[in-house]
Design a protein with these regions (language model features):
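Catalytic and substrate-binding regions of extracellular carbohydrate-active enzymes
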Residues: 21-25, 33-242
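Basic, alpha-helical interaction scaffolds
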Residues: 1-18
């Protein structure tokens, strides 16, 4: 997806900056080498992932640099904030803004979008971003009153505009009701976000050596130590389970 975004931005900015043909060719080849069939499923030896981790990090850094150059070339000078949508269709998006003192964004129609600040940076929920395009917003740094669309009746019951969420005593999703489609998402008796661990003792090799009976011995991770709603704001609700 990063490479597709880079290619799109490079085409859009080609009237201002030259298309980075050599760089994109090198990046594609590096990425495709690391799509080898033993690497993708996690079945290569440990040393392979030490190498690919460094190579992916270097590629991501280069892609980010090229993308930033092209987005900057497409933006008009000014104090606004420009948001790009590289998807092939218009839509609503939750956009990360990083660390910022911006409290809200204002579009050209006068619609105000509140910004929520979290431990992982600021986020804003934007409506109808244009397909493969961008939109510039004015920024507001003064405090904005914005009610949250999320309601907690207690620590284990959350209401959102789209869902009813219920957690059990282990922190598992006991119920997820889809309000728009009027349906229960889980089958009766099933839970969401259940982590199940299986015993893995290879007989001969470190990889590709999975016992046919491995499913007969497993452990469910249900020893909940802490359940805390860390964030409830205009954009998101953040739940932390330990």
């Amino acid at each position: 997806l990063h490479m597709m975004d880079l290619e799109l931005l490079s085409v859009l900015a080609s009237g201002v900056l030259p298309y980075p043909a050599e760089e994109t060719d090198r990046l594609w080849k590096g990425m495709l080498i690391n799509q080898f069939h033993d690497i993708l499923p996690g079945s290569s030896i440990h040393e392979v992932y030490e190498v690919t981790k460094k190579e992916y990090a270097a590629m991501e850094e280069k892609i980010a640099q090229l993308e930033q150059e092209r987005m900057a070339a497409l933006c008009a000078p000014g104090d606004g904030l420009t948001v790009f949508n590289t998807k092939g269709f218009a839509g609503d998006e939750i956009v990360p803004l990083g660390e910022t003192d911006v409290q809200a964004l204002l579009d050209e129609a006068g619609t105000l979008y509140p910004v929520q600040h979290t431990e992982k940076g600021a986020f804003v929920s934007l409506k109808d971003l244009p397909a493969q395009g961008w939109r510039t917003y004015q920024t507001r740094t003064e405090a904005v009153s914005a009610p949250s669309p999320f309601t907690l009746s207690d620590d284990r019951h959350l209401e959102t505009p789209s869902y009813t969420v219920e957690l059990d005593e282990h922190g598992l999703f006991a119920r997820l009701y889809d309000k728009e489609n009027r349906r229960e998402v889980f089958k009766a008796g099933q839970k969401g976000n259940l982590m199940r661990m299986y015993e893995d003792k290879p007989i001969y090799y470190d990889n590709w050596d999975i016992d046919i009976y491995y499913t007969e011995k497993s452990w469910d991770v249900t020893d909940l130590q802490r359940l805390e709603w860390e964030e409830i704001g205009p954009v998101c609700a953040v739940l932390k389970l330990e």
